[in-house]
Regions:
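Membrane-interface interhelical loops and short amphipathic "cap" helices
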Residues: 1-21, 48-55, 79-101, 153-189, ...
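Aromatic-rich transmembrane-lumenal/periplasmic boundary elements in polytopic membrane proteins
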Residues: 151, 233-353
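Membrane-interface helix-loop-helix modules in multi-pass inner-membrane proteins
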Residues: 66-136, 153, 463-466
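N-terminal signal-anchor module of multipass membrane proteins
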Residues: 1-46, 54-58, 63-70
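C-terminal substrate/ligand-recognition segments
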Residues: 391, 395-458, 489-513
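Membrane-interfacial loop-to-helix junctions in multi-pass inner-membrane proteins
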Residues: 47-65, 91-97, 101, 121-139, ...
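Internal alpha-helical transmembrane segments
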Residues: 116-124, 129-135, 146-155, 175, ...
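Hydrophobic alpha-helical membrane-insertion segments
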Residues: 64-73, 135-158, 231-242, 348, ...
């Protein structure tokens, strides 16, 4: 039974990861291209130039293809919370379900309503109403992203909630704390602006293809003029929010930061590793250098993490074994405290079965934040509740090589995109872009790199918080449903075939429409 449940957990993780990866292949383009279409239609509305109407309609056609297929994968992703992660859904459904419900009721219906006007309202409604519908579609798409990212951010940094021992559920106490937590605000800004960059590079890549083939040169140059400026501004914002994210992660998820940097032993004035190759045999328990070679920037990690070049940045060993000098509790003690909290829950369950009201009242007081004993117990023991389900401290260490290389792919690509978009804008402004074929090829190659960087960003976010489904409160190992592993494995392969077919269909349809090009003038 236990071995089958462990297989269920692994298959559920694999299925969710696969679904999320496929879904995120469609989402960034939807978010960014909707804004670009709205900008182009705004230019048409202000100038009355039919060229911009023709251009906007072309990009809307590509947006529509991507939007339709992205919705299908997103619906399946949400259903998996109930089918594969029912323990998680019960434990935090009151909190996690709220933003998802708002996303479905408000954002999704907003974009679903106005997307019809956006596609079929040309020459049927006024220009002003059509422009409003296009902008509302874009706003709706990005509002959907807001609520999904708020829910995800709460998993990374659970705030605005309290634990109800009678229902064994976490319940929301402050909607605004959940919505406006520093993790949520930063994650939304960083994720959405990076999606805008991807969409801008998509537009530039398609236009580069037209210029290489000597087709639709005016449309290509004008589209690059819009996309390069839009993408460059968003790339700079993405870099800024990425820097802020480092400071936030250092405070709320120090193990993630240590794994991203492959920092095993903490240091004052810690250096930031720009590039490096890890030794695969490096282990948590030894102090040898984890790299074959690396190029590091002195004191930069401390400066970026704590805004102090001499600040102490804890390493993996510090977080696992503890470091009394810097007030870091060893993980084994967190595990012991978590087991105390779990034991109290078991006592409560037994007291309820026997009708022992005195014991029930005693334990309720421990879980009540408004009582003196509750204030102490919740801070000293329940704060480490999730650790009680772990077997060893080593389980708190995520996959260091995967995180280390994914992070550098994401950051390196982001820096490259700033340079590429700036160069594209400059050459296009000087009317020399179509003659610089090497630059057109760079724009083409940046499109798949943008998708890789976007996926790498989610690997950093999600693998970096392992083993937690909810940071410090619920490990992934206890979040899954108790269903047969064979059922999850079967649906994994069904979804894999389905999503692959959808992806192939999208690519083929997009390529066909790009070859057809805009409507004839």
């Amino acid at each position: 039974m236990l071995s089958d449940y462990l297989q269920t957990v692994d298959w559920s993780r694999a299925q969710f990861a696969m679904t999320a990866i496929y879904h995120w292949l469609f989402v960034p383009l939807t978010l960014g291209l909707s804004i670009i279409c709205a900008i182009m239609e705004t230019i048409y509305y202000r100038t009355g130039d039919p060229f911009w109407k023709r251009t906007a309609k072309f990009w809307m056609r590509l947006f529509g293809i991507n939007f339709a297929i992205g919705v299908a994968t997103g619906l399946i992703l949400e259903f998996e919370f109930g089918t594969n992660w029912s323990n998680y859904s019960h434990f935090v459904g009151d909190i996690f379900g709220a933003p998802l419900a708002i996303e479905g009721i408000l954002a999704f219906f907003l974009e679903s309503t106005f997307v019809a006007v956006m596609f079929f309202g040309w020459n049927r409604v006024s220009r002003g109403f059509h422009l409003s519908a296009t902008w509302l579609t874009a706003v709706g798409a990005n509002l959907s992203a807001l609520w999904i990212l708020v829910a995800n951010s709460w998993m990374q940094y659970p705030v605005g909630c309290t634990f109800n021992i009678d229902t064994v559920r976490n319940e929301m106490t402050s909607f605004w704390d959940v919505l406006l937590s520093p993790v949520a605000v930063n994650k939304f800004t960083h994720t959405v602006t990076s999606s805008f960059v991807l969409a801008a590079l998509f537009v530039c890549a398609v236009c580069a293809w037209y210029l290489l083939r000597g087709r639709e040169q005016k449309m290509a140059r004008k589209s690059i003029a819009v996309a390069s400026v839009f993408g460059l501004v968003c790339a700079l914002i993405t870099a800024f929010t990425g820097d802020l994210s480092g400071a936030i992660v250092a405070r709320v998820q120090p193990m993630k930061l240590a794994a991203l940097e492959a920092l095993y032993d903490g240091e004052e004035g810690a250096a930031l590793t720009a590039v490096g190759i890890l030794r695969p045999e490096a282990e948590r328990s030894n102090n040898e250098d984890a790299f074959y070679f690396k190029i590091a920037i002195p004191k930069m990690l401390s400066l970026m993490s704590f805004r102090d070049a001499d600040a102490f940045v804890p390493g993996i060993n510090d977080l696992v074994n503890g470091n009394p000098q810097y007030g870091i509790m060893p993980t084994i003690e967190k595990i012991e405290r978590g087991r105390v909290a779990i034991a109290e829950l078991e006592r409560f369950k037994q007291a309820r079965e026997t009708g022992d009201e005195a014991t029930l009242d005693e334990i309720r007081a421990k879980f009540d934040p408004d009582t003196p004993e509750g204030a102490v117990f919740l801070k000293e023991y329940f704060a480490y509740f999730g650790y009680g389900y772990l077997d060893s401290p080593a389980q708190t260490v995520p996959n260091v090589p995967l995180l280390f290389y994914s992070f550098r792919l994401m950051v390196g690509a982001g820096c490259l995109f700033i340079l590429v978009l700036a160069a594209a804008w400059w050459f296009n402004r000087r009317d020399t872009l179509e003659r610089k074929r090497w630059m057109l090829w760079v724009l083409l190659l940046c499109m798949p790199l943008a998708y890789l960087a976007s996926q790498a960003g989610w690997i950093v976010a999600e693998v970096g918080r392992q083993p937690w489904a909810i940071q410090d409160l619920m490990p992934v190992g206890v979040a899954a449903s108790r269903i047969a592993s064979g059922s999850v494995a079967t649906t994994f392969f069904i979804f894999l075939v389905l999503f692959t077919a959808l992806l192939v269909a999208e690519i083929s349809i997009l390529c066909k429409q790009i070859k057809i090009g805009p409507e004839k003038e």
